[in-house]
């Protein structure tokens, strides 16, 4: 895995969570109805990114347009239970909602498999942790990020040799052992390189270095809210959190509702990530047939052919949270599967999102 971080999201082992490329390869062939938002590449060598203009959130009323809720529910439910991309990943739990509450949800089961996932199923988040940490830093800075924060949260800091954390370590302990975790690489500084080292180093820089799993979870909840009941299996800021879909959905609703400052910053400071189309990109887990952007601890699905501008942060074991480009809706696809399952969850989740937004099952 360490030999080729740019070509696959897969992690070689079930535990520890994370590592340098913590979710599965994301070949997403779906053409979505919404127009692609935000530009792809930008910026010269070593400079700040060209910042795409994020979509504006709705200013009043309840989102929905002319499509009736019953039509949306029917389309989303049909997609989750019948579309081949979704039945292939069963069992899983899914949910779509707005800033106030869930609007539709369900458990899709598999014959012969006794596992049933619900909103209260506790599971590893893997790279979905990144979105939480981005929101934590935004709260810590009262919404005004420093240039150093931005470089670390958009994976351009030069800390690009992360391997794993051990459960009993602190944040700083993980930076020290294995030694590669805290290594700075001059040749990657200022260029996009998908790796957990950026966030681990930033965690130390913002004062989290002495915290172990329990203390880290307490501190994150202090700013994100105790109702976002995350815990940590290892003190890794890019991939060590655990939670239920219900907990993560509360986090997404807070982003939509403006209770967390990152909600207003979604998609900002985004950088190009495809080395084939962007001179400032070195390593990405997204297939090079697609060009996504990376914002402050979350992806922006901006590929001009198949992207819809949604914000997301898929995890290695199949947890896929998203917010749509208009910042009207959120969703989750949640399961605890083998390492490398983020791709399949994203494929299903994008279809459910399209069904909800358009009212038509793909």
Please annotate each region the language model reported.
Residues 61-74, 307-362:
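Structured C-terminal helix/loop/strand segments within mature extracytoplasmic catalytic/sensor domains
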Residues 37-40:
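C-terminal motif of bacterial Sec signal peptides marking the signal peptidase cleavage site
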Residues 72-119, 320-324, 328-335:
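A short, well-structured edge-of-sheet supersecondary motif
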Residues 42-45:
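Bacterial signal peptide processing site
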Residues 192, 207-311, 316:
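Penicillin-binding protein/beta-lactamase superfamily catalytic region
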Residues 86-90, 99, 105-106, 111-195, ...:
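Active-site-proximal loop and beta-strand segments within enzyme catalytic domains
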Residues 1-23:
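N-terminal secretory signal peptides that target proteins for export/translocation
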Residues 49-85:
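N-terminal low-complexity, Pro/Thr/Ser-rich intrinsically disordered segments
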């Amino acid at each position: 895995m360490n030999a080729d971080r740019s070509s696959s999201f897969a992690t070689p082992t079930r535990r520890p969570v994370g590592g340098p490329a913590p979710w599965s390869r994301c070949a997403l062939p779906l053409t979505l109805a919404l127009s692609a938002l935000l530009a792809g590449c930008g910026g010269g060598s070593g400079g700040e990114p060209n910042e795409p203009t994020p979509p504006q959130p709705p200013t009043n009323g309840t989102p929905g347009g002319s499509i009736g809720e019953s039509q949306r529910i029917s389309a989303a439910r049909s997609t989750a239970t019948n579309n081949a991309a979704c039945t292939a990943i069963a069992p899983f739990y899914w949910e779509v909602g707005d800033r106030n509450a869930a609007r539709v949800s369900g458990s899709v089961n598999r014959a012969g498999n006794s596992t049933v996932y619900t909103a209260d199923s506790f599971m590893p988040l893997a790279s979905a942790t990144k979105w939480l940490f981005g929101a934590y830093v935004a709260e810590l800075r009262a919404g005004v990020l420093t240039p150093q924060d931005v470089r670390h949260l958009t994976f351009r800091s030069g800390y690009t040799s992360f391997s794993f954390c051990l459960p009993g370590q602190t944040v700083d302990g993980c930076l020290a052992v294995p030694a590669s975790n805290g290594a700075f690489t001059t040749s990657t500084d200022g260029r996009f390189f998908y790796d957990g080292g950026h966030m681990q180093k930033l965690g130390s820089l913002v004062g989290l270095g002495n915290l172990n799993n329990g203390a880290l979870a307490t501190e994150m909840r202090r700013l994100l809210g105790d109702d976002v009941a995350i815990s940590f299996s290892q003190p890794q800021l890019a991939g060590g959190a655990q939670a239920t879909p219900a907990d993560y959905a509360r986090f997404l609703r807070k982003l939509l509702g403006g209770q967390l400052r990152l909600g207003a910053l979604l998609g900002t400071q985004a950088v190009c990530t495809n080395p084939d189309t962007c001179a400032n990109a070195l390593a990405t887990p997204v297939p090079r047939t697609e060009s996504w952007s990376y914002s402050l601890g979350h992806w922006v699905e901006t590929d001009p052919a198949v992207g819809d501008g949604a914000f997301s942060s898929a995890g290695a074991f199949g947890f896929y949270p998203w917010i749509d480009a208009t910042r009207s809706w959120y969703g989750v696809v949640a399961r605890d599967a083998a390492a490398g399952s983020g791709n399949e969850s994203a494929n299903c989740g994008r279809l459910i999102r399209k069904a909800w937004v358009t009212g038509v099952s793909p």
